[in-house]
Amino acid sequence: MKLSPREVEVITLVALGYSDKEIGVTLKITYGTVRNHIDKVILKLQAQNRTHAVMIYKFINRDWLEEYYEENNHTLDSRNVLSK
């Protein structure tokens, strides 16, 4: 089953180590909405939990995180969203 663009954004941030609170701040959505998106991703991918969902999505879309980094000029140190 295909993920929505917002679900892809959420699972990408989960894969990058963002907490639910950080995802909400970054995407300007509530904590509850973040949880809803994560729950939908887990169901769609038939995963056991969020970590398993990331692993499944990474397996299906092998270049997914690399493309995200290239498109957004991210580095591993660029995630200080709560310190703004």
Features from the language model and the residues they span:
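Intrinsically disordered, low-complexity Ser/Thr- and Pro-rich stretches
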Residues: 16, 28-31, 68-75
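Basic, Lys/Arg-enriched C-terminal extension of HTH/homeodomain DNA-binding domains
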Residues: 43-84
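Recognition helix of helix-turn-helix DNA-binding domains
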Residues: 19-52
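The N-cap/first-turn positions of alpha helices
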Residues: 6-7
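Short amphipathic alpha-helical boundary/capping segments
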Residues: 1-3
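Poly-acidic low-complexity segments
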Residues: 12-15, 63
